[in-house]
């Protein structure tokens, strides 16, 4: 099988040296992502496209899906590459490929041509289109808004029969811009802002301020791992978890109620800036949107920025909540966010929307900054690729099994799309489908007299969810790894 990768248009308008660098990085990213599916595949870069050739037909759908989620790719063409002799030969091959697809449909033919030929692209379009119209009685030519567009590419003596076109996410390849550190809470905003920076070519590391115990961290790990695995797995990234409960306790004890929200955000920026400096990261990323909550007024955002020299990026600053939720739905983090507890909003009962710098600084004079230094020093830094392994070590009380008993039911926790693409069937045991993002609200509705064997393809999400369910008091869960 063969795929032609078309570059994001902004890459094609760069200078020659920058364009070549971007294409080289994108080629490497594609190799890093696809090697998990087929180690023998070939990735070949050209000036205006990248070719991916693979032998394992069983991985066709998985490879195609992975390509649509790699930043820097505008669209993917799934093609059949065949030799041709003349225009009539092109027509015959197009007829064999598209006859069934064009039955009873309107169509047009579009041709791109490279190399020296005795014919032009328009001549091929007319010849092939006329031939298809004559030989398929129920088909009809329509040049504007047809039901089917027959895409053909002619390159020297080769004909590319385009079997399908699939849109990518666009943007710049990860690694073409510098690293950033996303302050992730697991909610709608931070997930979307992290995705937007990945799409713009940044390697995104994650910094999580834990205010709600182990269950909260497990939930946020799931979001971060999902984002990385889906859009950024071409690169190694860090997940830094900071236990911020001592800081919150100090704020509650020492800071005036109305100033707590701004002071907390200033402490978070101070801590994140220390982490960024430690790892050579150039900017912080937050999901703040102007006026969304009390701490996100211009006055308060300016005061928050003042505590650090580190650049703070706010890609959602002008977005409304509905737009953010729609984006979360598109990238697959909406259901995570809906079940994620929110802790920051309850810290202050009467928050100020226009904090005064002198008053904030006076309140902070009462704060013991050694507490902040200590929690940053004790921060837990995990390689995102090791989250699966670390989770496996943490889930010591959850048994992993490869077989099943009479009372066992396999619970397929993959997303609905994954289940539809590759349904799980295991002989001798019932399989129930419940996507991972619904477990927190729907698992209790299942028959609790059964033992539920959680399963996902790679075993990462099943272990995380098993730990979460154990934290919630469910003892009838195991991890199924055949």
From Swiss-Prot:
Localization of this protein: Cytoplasm
Record-annotated active site: 456
BP GO terms, sorted: thiamine biosynthetic process; thiamine diphosphate biosynthetic process; thiazole biosynthetic process; tRNA 4-thiouridine biosynthesis
Start and end residues of each Rhodanese domain: 404-482
PROSITE patterns assigned: RHODANESE_3, THUMP
GO CC annotation, single: cytosol
EC main group: transferase
InterPro entries for the chain: Rhodanese-like_dom, Rhodanese-like_dom_sf, Rossmann-like_a/b/a_fold, ThiI_AANH, ThiI_fer, ThiI_N, THII_Thiazole_biosynth_dom, THUMP_dom
Entry function: Catalyzes the ATP-dependent transfer of a sulfur to tRNA to produce 4-thiouridine in position 8 of tRNAs, which functions as a near-UV photosensor. Also catalyzes the transfer of sulfur to the sulfur carrier protein ThiS, forming ThiS-thiocarboxylate. This is a step in the synthesis of thiazole, in the thiamine biosynthesis pathway. The sulfur is donated as persulfide by IscS.
Protein name, per record: tRNA sulfurtransferase
């Amino acid at each position: 099988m063969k795929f032609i990768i078309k570059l994001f248009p902004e890459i094609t308008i760069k200078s020659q040296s920058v364009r070549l660098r971007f294409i080289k990085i994108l080629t490497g990213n594609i190799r890093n992502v696809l090697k998990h599916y087929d180690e023998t595949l070939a990735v070949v870069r050209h000036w205006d496209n990248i070719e991916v050739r693979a032998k394992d037909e069983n991985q066709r759908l998985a490879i195609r899906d992975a390509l649509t989620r790699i930043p820097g790719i505008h669209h993917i063409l799934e093609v059949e590459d065949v030799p041709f002799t003349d225009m009539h030969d092109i027509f015959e091959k197009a007829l064999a490929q598209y006859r069934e697809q064009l039955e009873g449909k309107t169509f047009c033919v579009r041709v791109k041509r490279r190399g020296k030929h005795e014919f032009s692209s328009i001549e091929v379009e007319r010849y092939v289109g006329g031939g298809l119209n004559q030989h398929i009685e129920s088909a009809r030519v329509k040049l504007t808004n047809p039901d089917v567009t027959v895409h053909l590419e002619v390159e020297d003596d080769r004909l590319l029969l385009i079997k399908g076109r699939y849109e990518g996410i666009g943007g710049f390849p990860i690694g073409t811009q510098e690293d950033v550190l996303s302050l992730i809470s697991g909610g709608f905003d931070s997930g979307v802002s992290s995705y937007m920076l990945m799409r713009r070519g940044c390697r995104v590391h994650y910094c999580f301020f834990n205010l709600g115990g182990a269950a909260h961290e497990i939930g946020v790990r799931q979001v971060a791992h999902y984002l990385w695995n889906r859009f950024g797995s071409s690169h190694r990234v860090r997940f830094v978890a900071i236990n911020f409960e001592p800081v919150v306790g100090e704020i509650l004890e020492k800071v005036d109620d109305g100033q707590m929200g701004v002071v907390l955000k200033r402490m978070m920026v101070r801590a994140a800036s220390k982490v960024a400096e430690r790892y050579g990261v150039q900017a912080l990323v937050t999901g703040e949107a102007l006026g969304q909550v009390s701490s996100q007024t211009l006055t308060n955002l300016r005061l928050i920025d003042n505590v650090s020299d580190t650049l703070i990026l706010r890609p959602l600053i002008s977005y409304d909540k509905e737009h953010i939720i729609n984006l979360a739905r598109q990238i697959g983090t909406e259901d995570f966010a809906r079940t994620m507890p929110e802790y920051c909003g309850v810290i202050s009962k009467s928050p100020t929307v226009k904090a005064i710098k002198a008053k904030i600084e006076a309140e902070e004079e009462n704060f013991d900054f050694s507490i902040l230094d200590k929690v940053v020093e004790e921060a837990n830094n995990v390689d995102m690729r090791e989250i699966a392994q670390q989770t496996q070590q943490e889930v010591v009380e959850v048994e992993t099994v490869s077989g099943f008993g009479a009372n066992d039911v396999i619970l397929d926790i993959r997303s609905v799309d994954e289940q539809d693409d590759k349904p799980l069937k295991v002989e001798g045991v019932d399989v129930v489908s419940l996507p991972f993002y619904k477990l927190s609200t729907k698992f209790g509705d299942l028959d609790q007299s059964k033992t539920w064997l959680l399963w996902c393809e790679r075993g990462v999400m099943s272990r995380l969810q098993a730990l979460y369910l154990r934290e919630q008091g469910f003892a009838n869960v195991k991890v199924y790894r055949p």
